[in-house]
């Protein structure tokens, strides 16, 4: 009899422990939803891009001068992408407007946006952009950051259901093909990846270019996947605790992790990720937290707001693919931290941050 009572007690204890465990799992495994685009955010973000894509000054040209005849205004040199302070920001300013229209085809400012886009992305203007890249002194202009954003813009135009935007894709196509070929050529000959937290980051450039290439350029997709494996597949112990650098707007570790998510099968990716960022999958908030911008008037220091957004899109993509609520929660925290501080009136951030915020929102979709 005493053994029977002991057995029953053990069963009851086991059931109680199981019940407690289930409650704990329910608390920690609740579905966390990413922050996504809505009409209010679209209305807020479009103003940044709409205002700046035809604002010619201030402007940072990043030009190599062959002689005095090269000295021209930004609009003369880049009749399509002359606004938003620099070429790449003008490109992703266009991308922002196109994506807002793609998401909200009846957007209240649709006609005004399309009119402005038709003015900048004309056939004649695009041919002038190509002339600039053909110049012997500027063949590597905007490599690879601006190139990657150009392919993002092309992808969004190609996938639009708005006839006027489809027509603009045809206008842009010669430049798209030029950039596509430049990416193939460069990624093939690059011996070592560039691992910084700013524009030249190879993983970022490859990741954005691959998003385009998967549907529109089999050759570029093949090159990126092959080179990404050569560059990154054997990487271990990425020093994410060294991040961020003071001028970073990209996370070298997370950009690489996001690229490899697109390159490796899921099973292989899990093994790779746990070696590349040990412990990150289970406790990501122990490794990174939102960064603070001390001086938003300083263009380089303002990069850190962009870092919060780019971390967001990396964490969303990885977190959603792996059903990892902790990553999604951390992404939400990063997004909210910078989104609430965007409208400071400082052009140092206003000319580009809307694109980063929108891309983060799209990654959460």
Residue map of PLM features:
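C-terminal motif of bacterial Sec signal peptides marking the signal peptidase cleavage site
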Residues: 12-14
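Bacterial signal peptide processing site
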Residues: 16-18
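Low-complexity, Ser/Thr/Pro/Gly-enriched N-terminal "stalk/linker" regions
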Residues: 27-82, 346
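Well-ordered alpha-helical scaffold segments within catalytic/enzyme domains
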Residues: 30-37, 91-107, 148-165, 205-216, ...
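Solvent-exposed loop and edge beta-strand segments that line ligand/cofactor-binding
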Residues: 34-39, 74-91, 132-148, 189-202, ...
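Long, well-ordered core segments of solenoidal/helical folds
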Residues: 45-58, 112-131, 171-192, 220-240, ...
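Extended ligand-binding groove/face enriched in aromatic
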Residues: 83, 91, 98-212
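Fungal-biased detection of long, low-complexity, Ser/Thr-
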Residues: 289-365
């Amino acid at each position: 009899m005493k053994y029977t009572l002991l057995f029953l007690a053990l069963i009851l204890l086991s059931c109680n422990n199981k019940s407690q465990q289930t409650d704990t799992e329910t608390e920690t495994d609740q579905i966390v939803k990413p922050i996504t685009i809505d009409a209010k955010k679209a209305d807020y973000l479009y103003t940044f891009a709409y205002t700046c894509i035809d604002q010619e000054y201030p402007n940072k040209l990043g030009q190599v001068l062959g002689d005095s005849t090269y000295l021209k205004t930004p609009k003369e040199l880049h009749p399509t992408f002359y606004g938003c302070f620099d070429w790449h920001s003008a490109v992703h300013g266009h991308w922002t407007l196109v994506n807002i229209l793609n998401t909200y085809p009846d957007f209240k400012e649709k006609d005004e946006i399309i009119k402005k886009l038709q003015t900048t992305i004309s056939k004649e203007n695009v041919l002038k952009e190509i002339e600039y890249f053909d110049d012997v002194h500027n063949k590597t202009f905007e490599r690879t950051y601006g190139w990657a954003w150009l392919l993002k813009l092309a992808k969004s135009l190609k996938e639009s259901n708005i006839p006027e935007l489809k027509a603009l894709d045809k206008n842009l196509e010669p430049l798209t093909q030029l950039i596509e070929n430049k990416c193939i050529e460069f990624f093939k000959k690059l011996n070592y990846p560039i691992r910084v937290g700013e524009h030249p980051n190879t993983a970022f450039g490859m990741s954005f270019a691959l998003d385009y290439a998967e549907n529109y350029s089999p050759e570029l997709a093949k090159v990126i996947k092959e080179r990404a494996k050569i560059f990154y597949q054997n990487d271990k112990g990425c020093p994410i605790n060294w991040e961020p650098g003071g001028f970073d707007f990209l996370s070298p570790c997370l950009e690489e992790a996001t690229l490899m998510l697109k390159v490796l099968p899921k099973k292989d990716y899990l093994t790779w990720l746990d070696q590349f960022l040990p412990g990150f999958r289970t406790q990501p908030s122990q490794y990174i937290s939102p960064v603070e911008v001390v001086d938003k008037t300083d263009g380089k220091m303002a990069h850190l707001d962009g870092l919060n957004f780019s971390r967001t899109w990396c964490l969303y993509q990885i977190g959603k693919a792996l059903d990892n609520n902790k990553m999604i929660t951390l992404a939400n925290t990063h997004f909210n931290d910078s989104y609430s501080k965007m409208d400071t009136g400082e052009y140092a951030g206003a000319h580009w941050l809307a694109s980063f915020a929108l891309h983060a929102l799209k990654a959460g979709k």
